[in-house]
Regions:
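Intrinsically disordered, low-complexity terminal regions
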Residues: 1-242
């Protein structure tokens, strides 16, 4: 791979798990395939696309139809400095510790984000979103959106972002909100707050799901010394390949 090359994972047949993969410009992919006998085989052949992106896109042969018990789940180790784009059908997407911008979308699966060192765009139709965010990149315009699912978001006091939220369900938060009602619209409530400095923006949207915006507290040791750095490392530097 070349430095800065975008990694695209497009898996309509199952889940995608992405983790930080080190500092060398190389992608490592693991696949778990489940197939009944005598069905069209899901093929996996990573390749460079015409626009220079590195693409991991399993596909059935032309005319093949996915069977109910047939799926392929992917685990991808993403090197530092490479942006990641993920697409699934109803598959679950979780991204932990990736050090680049992340753009993910599922047609109906749940999304989990933790320790991402870049700007985030995440969208699902009917699934829920659970995320833990640290300081946003300066000037970033981040967005978490679902049509009907809940959004549960933990953030630091130094997020440094103007936060806009919208839903027709409930807001539950540790932060003070400026809430406005919009009767007859969907979503019918909007809320705004600023966490830290107003140096970026974060939009959180669900038409009908609850939005929970929680403060991530720093850890205090038994001796009374604050260990915020340790807590951040535990929450943000998630480099395992689970």
């Amino acid at each position: 791979m070349t430095p800065g090359q975008v990694i695209i994972v497009d898996n309509p047949y199952g889940d995608v798990h992405a983790r930080f993969g080190g500092y060398e410009h190389a992608v490592e992919t693991h696949a778990v395939l489940q197939e009944p006998p005598h069905v069209a085989h899901i093929q996996l052949s990573p390749a460079l696309t015409a626009d220079g992106h590195y693409t991991i896109a399993p596909r059935l042969p032309a005319g093949g139809i996915q069977q109910p018990s047939q799926r392929i789940d992917l685990s991808v180790l993403v090197p530092e400095g490479h942006d990641l784009r993920v697409r699934t059908g109803a598959g679950f997407i979780d991204v932990h510790g990736v050090r680049g911008n992340v753009d993910i979308k599922s047609e109906g699966g749940n999304i989990e984000l933790r320790g991402v060192k870049g700007a985030i765009q995440a969208e699902t139709t009917g699934g829920a979103i659970e995320a833990s965010l640290g300081r946003a990149p300066h000037g970033a315009r981040q967005r978490l959106a679902t049509t009907t699912g809940d959004i549960d978001l933990g953030i630091d006091d130094d997020l440094d972002a103007a936060v806009d939220m919208a839903t027709s369900a409930l807001f539950a938060t540790d932060f003070s909100l400026d809430v406005t009602q919009h009767p007859g619209e969907e979503p019918n409530k909007r809320a705004r707050t600023t966490v830290g400095r107003n140096a970026s923006s974060l939009a959180i949207e669900s038409r009908r799901g609850q939005i929970r915006l929680r403060r991530r507290a720093g850890f205090t040791s038994v001796g009374g010394a604050s260990s915020d750095a340790t807590a951040k490392q535990d929450g943000d530097e998630d480099n395992d390949s689970d």
